[in-house]
Amino acid sequence: MSFLDKFFGKEKSSAKSASDRLKLVLAHERAVNLPYLEEMKREILEVIKKYTHAEKIEIKADSNQQIDTLEVEIVLGKNS
């Protein structure tokens, strides 16, 4: 181990980097291709619109090796 490796660490091998990128792409594809996801998003949007005056609604799906997540961000408007 060289002197600089102690401070900056070793660079990842290209195989490890490629493997990490592939895992990320596969996880994203898995999250996006859930068969019920589009209908679930539509239903969530309907419920949010029914009960709020949201200025912005954003729904994001994500997946990693252990868990699938659905993140909903709602910006509520001021009450009139």
Swiss-Prot record:
Keyword Cell cycle recorded: yes
Highest taxon, organism lineage: Bacteria
Keyword Cell cycle appears in the UniProt entry: yes
Keywords attached to this entry: Cell cycle, Cell division
GO biological process: cell division; regulation of division septum assembly
Matches recorded under Pfam families: MinE
Family: Belongs to the MinE family.
Function: Prevents the cell division inhibition by proteins MinC and MinD at internal division sites while permitting inhibition at polar sites. This ensures cell division at the proper site by restricting the formation of a division septum at the midpoint of the long axis of the cell.
Name of protein: Cell division topological specificity factor
Organism listed in the record: Wolinella succinogenes (strain ATCC 29543 / DSM 1740 / CCUG 13145 / JCM 31913 / LMG 7466 / NCTC 11488 / FDC 602W)
Annotated gene: minE
